[in-house]
């Protein structure tokens, strides 16, 4: 039966591992894109479209593939008409994880077991909207009811973190912690770089008229983020290049950019390489974990990018080389004894063996110091998860894996943790069935509990956050 108690669990051992060990473990969502202001204000969603379809480019891509007009995806159609357009799309999504996720979310959050389609949509709309108007379905209660203990948002160095501070004072059931994401500091060639620099100046209350002053300001913000509970950084390295240079070079490049001159590709790479290296040292000082998200190829549809902006469903994966540049970056940090705990993600799964074998060169003392990140974005599927888990086990110690994250903008996405846990238990159960792993429930049960929750709790050190 569809989505029965044992879906994705094809062996007895898998069923036992999930139901007795994985299912009840709390959730640490250590990388997501929820808005901390929305969490703090704790408002009701006005309807299911607002909770489900706003900002969800996963769904938008499927709707476009189904010929839905843009007016009913991101345009000015009513929320109800947008919901009906999604309901027309869902029956065609069998085999896509969104088919399972859609119905898991309806079941786990709203108790709706009916399949979503054009005929059932009006009934589901009414049932869910009535529930969304009640207290148990406010944003914070959705988080609590999903058994979430830690949420790490994604935050710019110039952000004030005011809502993190307010949540820290008021919310006892779960933590909402910032993540330091300094992409705008690194993207010196971006058109908005000088405007962003002005925002950072306002926050640090001093002029940023030199490279040295920028580095100092970022170090200051890292200290502030740490005080607010931050224990991770994150970087979008869509194209990974590395060029070392002498100490004077970044200062000259920075001055050239402020003067409005065009930078050469090599100058951009040198600046980014030096600034990222400096940041890595600061992360190490704070015992943070650094996340590197590699090989997204963004904003491919120029007309739609001009119309809708970024993060609207027009990104793909990249296939450029990465080993040499990444090795140079990691080796420079290791040689200087300031390589922090690191999680490496690639949007292109062909990169997994390269990342895994490279990270094995830098394991040291800390258990699982270097990690291959959970299947990211387009790899957040049953097959993608199994590939990531299998290759992790092939090249490292899967028992030390820090597990799943949502990487989501949706308050209803926590069922992805259940989906991941079922895939994990199913895979281990297959290993036992084939004689590749012992039928030792105590050992395997502990492994599953660790990957679901325990490893992340220890690795990131959230318990030290007051």
Where do the protein language model's features map onto the residues?
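Metal/cofactor-centered catalytic core regions of large enzymes
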Residues: 267, 313-316
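Short glycine/proline- and charge-enriched loop/turn segments
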Residues: 305-313
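Hard-cation-handling environments
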Residues: 296, 301
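Short, basic/hydrophobic alpha-helical segments
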Residues: 329-335
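Divalent-cation-assisted or electrostatically stabilized phosphate/pyrophosphate-binding catalytic cores
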Residues: 319-326
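C-terminal amphipathic alpha-helical interaction region
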Residues: 290-292
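Metal-cofactor-binding active-site regions of metalloenzymes
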Residues: 1-286, 338-340, 344-350, 356, ...
């Amino acid at each position: 039966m569809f989505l029965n108690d044992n879906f994705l669990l094809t062996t007895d051992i898998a069923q036992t591992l999930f139901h007795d060990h994985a299912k009840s473990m709390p959730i640490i969502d250590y990388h997501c894109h929820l808005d901390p202001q929305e969490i703090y204000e704790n408002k009701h969603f006005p309807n299911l479209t607002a909770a489900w379809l706003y900002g969800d480019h996963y769904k938008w891509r499927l709707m476009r593939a189904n010929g839905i007009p843009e007016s009913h995806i991101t345009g000015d159609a009513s929320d109800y008409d947008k919901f009906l357009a999604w309901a027309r799309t869902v029956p065609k999504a069998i085999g896509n994880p969104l088919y399972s996720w859609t119905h898991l979310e309806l079941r786990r959050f709203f108790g709706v077991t009916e399949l979503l389609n054009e005929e059932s949509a009006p009934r589901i709309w009414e049932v869910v909207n009535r529930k969304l108007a009640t207290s148990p379905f406010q944003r914070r209660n959705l988080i609590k009811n999903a058994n979430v203990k830690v949420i790490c948002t994604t935050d710019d160095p110039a952000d004030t973190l005011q809502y993190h501070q307010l949540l820290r004072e008021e919310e006892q059931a779960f933590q909402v912690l910032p993540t330091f994401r300094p992409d705008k500091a690194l993207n010196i060639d971006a058109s908005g770089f000088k405007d962003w620099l002005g925002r950072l100046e306002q926050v640090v209350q001093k002029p940023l008229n030199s490279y040295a002053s920028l580095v100092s300001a970022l170090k200051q913000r890292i200290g502030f983020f740490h005080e607010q509970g931050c224990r991770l950084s994150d970087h979008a390295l869509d194209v990974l290049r590395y060029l070392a240079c002498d100490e004077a070079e970044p200062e000259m490049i920075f001055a050239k950019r402020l003067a409005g001159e065009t930078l050469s590709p090599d100058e951009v790479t040198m600046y980014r390489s030096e600034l990222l290296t400096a940041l890595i040292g600061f992360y190490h000082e704070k015992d943070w974990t650094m996340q590197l998200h590699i090989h997204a190829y963004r904003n491919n549809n120029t007309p739609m990018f001009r119309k809708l902006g970024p993060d609207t469903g027009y990104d793909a994966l990249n296939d450029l080389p990465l080993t040499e540049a990444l090795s140079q970056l990691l080796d420079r940090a290791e040689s200087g004894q300031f390589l922090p705990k690191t999680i490496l993600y690639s949007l292109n799964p062909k990169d997994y063996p390269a990342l895994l074998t490279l990270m094995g060169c830098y394991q040291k003392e800390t258990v699982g110091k270097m990690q291959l990140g959970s299947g990211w974005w387009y790899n957040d599927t049953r097959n993608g998860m199994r590939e990531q888990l299998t290759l992790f086990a092939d090249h490292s110690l899967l028992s030390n894996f820090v597990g799943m994250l949502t990487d989501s903008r949706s308050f209803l996405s926590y069922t992805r943790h259940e989906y991941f846990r079922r895939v994990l238990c199913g895979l281990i159960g297959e290993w036992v069935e084939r004689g590749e792993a012992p039928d030792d429930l105590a050992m395997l049960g502990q492994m599953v509990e660790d990957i679901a929750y325990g490893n992340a709790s220890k690795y990131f050190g959230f318990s030290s956050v007051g």
